[in-house]
Amino acid sequence: MATLLRVSSLCRANRASAFKSLLIRPVPCLTQDHHMVQTSQIHTSPNHHAGSKAASMHWTSERALSVALLGLLPAAYLYPGAAMDYSLAAALTLHGHWGLGQVVTDYVHGDAKIKMANTSLFALSALTFAGLCYFNYHDVGICKAVSMLWSL
């Protein structure tokens, strides 16, 4: 049992003779330095939106629209009409805008590129909504067009 030595015997003056044995590994002395306290500093990025509920409300709105679309699509098939066509145009455009906005947020980097991508996204969403409204007003509408495609 040569490996079982008391720590106090290692801290004494005959420390060198105890370390000559191959079975014994050196053990540091257990002296306590209270004046030397090591602290770690954690640097975090500043939280700019800590008090804002805008992100939470946006997420809730996205989920509410997704759930509303689950009911709106079958209702549009069962009860087609102008109000349903324009509701679908608004809901689908907003759903697509929010979804593509997340793609832009995740994959576009650099201030100028982000501004250009967001401007393009707003233009695309506005053009999509205008095109769907034009189709609803001057043609058969979204509900009737989908039912005509399904009847082929």
UniProtKB/Swiss-Prot annotation:
Mark out the transit peptide: 1-21
Q: What the protein does?
A: Membrane-anchoring subunit of succinate dehydrogenase (SDH) that is involved in complex II of the mitochondrial electron transport chain and is responsible for transferring electrons from succinate to ubiquinone (coenzyme Q). SDH also oxidizes malate to the non-canonical enol form of oxaloacetate, enol-oxaloacetate. Enol-oxaloacetate, which is a potent inhibitor of the succinate dehydrogenase activity, is further isomerized into keto-oxaloacetate.
Biological processes per GO annotation = tricarboxylic acid cycle
What membrane topology does this protein have? Multi-pass membrane protein
Residues annotated as binding heme b are H95
User: What are the TM regions of this chain, as residue ranges?
Assistant: 57-78, 84-104, 114-135
Kindly give the Pfam families that the UniProt entry links to this protein.
CybS (PF05328)
- Which family, according to UniProt? Belongs to the CybS family.
Q: Which residue ranges does the entry give as Mitochondrial matrix-facing topology?
A: 22-56, 105-113
Localisation per UniProt entry:
Mitochondrion inner membrane
State the signal peptide span: none
- Where along this sequence does the record place binding of a ubiquinone? Y107
Q: Which GO terms describe its molecular function?
A: heme binding; metal ion binding; ubiquinone binding
Supply the name of the protein: Succinate dehydrogenase [ubiquinone] cytochrome b small subunit, mitochondrial
State the organism named in the record. Xenopus tropicalis
What pathway does this protein act in?
Carbohydrate metabolism; tricarboxylic acid cycle
Give the record's keywords alphabetically. Electron transport, Heme, Iron, Membrane, Metal-binding, Mitochondrion, Mitochondrion inner membrane, Transit peptide, Transmembrane, Transmembrane helix, Transport, Tricarboxylic acid cycle
Its encoding gene is what?
sdhd
Check the record and name the Gene3D superfamilies matching this protein: Fumarate reductase/succinate dehydrogenase, transmembrane subunit
Q: Which residues lie on this side of the membrane: Mitochondrial intermembrane?
A: 79-83, 136-152
